[in-house]
């Protein structure tokens, strides 16, 4: 005997699944539900349990049939007539019961009447059961009419396959199968599921019912096209073709980024720009040895980071331009850290080799400190010595770009709907919203309905980097398009859809979703919730950006932070530099989900605004041990700060007055917030904290005041400090107690 499930056995025995489960529990056989599998020996035991009942039932049925057969000749008996519900018979029985003298005559009349009524009753019951029989009277005609549609329903064929999305109600499933809802409810009951006609069925229940009917089931999975950034379309390997590499040129100011690109393109980009410094993101394509290379000329590295922060990698190769006569500069280090954080291969271009003071070996030596070791010195970083001015070494650089792109095996499918990224966007007076797009897969054509970020439209016109109109753009090709309803942001993703109606729906839905996201609180890593994230397994490494007042402090702080050892989490310093905390640091922290540590330095106004909008955690300290203790305590889950610093105002020192026995009086103008008499202050000079202390006196004209608001002038002295100079910034702050959650 083969195995079978509980519900199959219940169906075989024509009993509910719950009854079988109850029997099994009485036999000390544990089953969880009606889907449990029964072994052959268990099935045999169950058969023994159910067999005696079956025999008894058959015996009782046979006895009843025999009784009926023997009762047939005894039709005149009055006891039998009492079983029928005919009014006339009951009347006759009553009449027969009343007269005691005429009992025999009553019995004779009763016998004749009951014989006729019994025959009529049996004919009526037979017609009711079988849907047949003589159509005598109105009572017999009604059931025959009701049974007419039944044969038609049985003849209806079952579908070979049904599809559903999410779930189905009992009524919907019955309609798809072409069956009555009551039949489906009965089957569910046999499976141990109590359901009503409007009850939703899960996937398992739908599959069980359909398998019982021998119908194939297919579930439709809906894709949220509004979140098309998350949709990755897997292309077949045979559809992929080689695409041009996308190259970003990065480096320090005036090290020759735009001049290098100009030399490669044989155009005069630099002359068109104010002061020879790039003012916007440009995307250009050049041809080398019958192969194309796409260059992005970014203003420093802010746009590069912004695009990465938006969750999409655009650049394939980074060219790090370093002047041979200047060496590694702060922005060079920032560019290295940005490229490494994005896991993009770096090619170092040592520029200005035509200058007599050029020293490429010094540059190579300095870059070794940042793990960029030249190939000739046993490393894996490609170094190209060149001069953008004389065009010496350019061919070697371009060959190296093509070599790295071959190593990276950059491929894309051109035969699909286009997707890509916005490089630049602006509002043109004559043409309306204009966007420079970089196609990353597929082919963009004129007339395509398109969704770009949170806006939408139809591609009205396309212009390539040479200013010529084109009808289509393939992978890695930059084009400027018109036809959008609004100006998108640099770094936004775009996707082409089949029709403009759908593009509009998705564009509006994305705009609505962005509005909701802006209202909700963004979750960024902060020391306050760091331990919770570590505990939940969300954090494997803690990214830090370290800024300090002097190089010695930077090195000491980095060394101390890297020694912190907490099980399961490691500290990763993604950027360390000297100077005030800038907006660029906040951009990098946003892209890398990092915490900014400031040691003896302060964030500037733009950095503060960016940190507030992006919810980046900035920690400011003056004692190195406090930094280490705070980070270590946060990682171990012991961080419990009771007080939080709140900056209430800033004042700029416009003039100083030295008064004997008083000290230096600072004539100040309150630029932000307010300065209060009881607040603590710190003196900031060129972004570096010089002194922290308390206000000794605060006056307006000759009157002592409790506070001075924004836009007013005042005079103040700092307790035990007189080295105040014009141009210094006095920052007032208070310590507020924070209620811990």
Swiss-Prot record:
Compartment(s): Cytoplasm
Basic residues compositional bias, start-end: 127-139
Keywords attached to this entry: Cytoplasm, GTP-binding, Initiation factor, Nucleotide-binding, Protein biosynthesis
Presence of the UniProt keyword GTP-binding in the record: yes
Keyword Cytoplasm listed: yes
Annotated binding of GTP, by residue: 251-258, 297-301, 351-354
Span list, region G4: 351-354
Gene3D superfamilies: 1.10.10.2480, P-loop containing nucleotide triphosphate hydrolases, Translation factors, Translation initiation factor IF- 2, domain 3
Ranges annotated as biased composition (Basic and acidic residues): 48-74, 107-123
PROSITE patterns per the UniProt record, alphabetical: G_TR_2 (PS51722), IF2 (PS01176)
Biased segments, Low complexity type: 140-151
Region (Disordered): 48-158
Function: One of the essential components for the initiation of protein synthesis. Protects formylmethionyl-tRNA from spontaneous hydrolysis and promotes its binding to the 30S ribosomal subunits. Also involved in the hydrolysis of GTP during the formation of the 70S ribosomal complex.
Protein name: Translation initiation factor IF-2
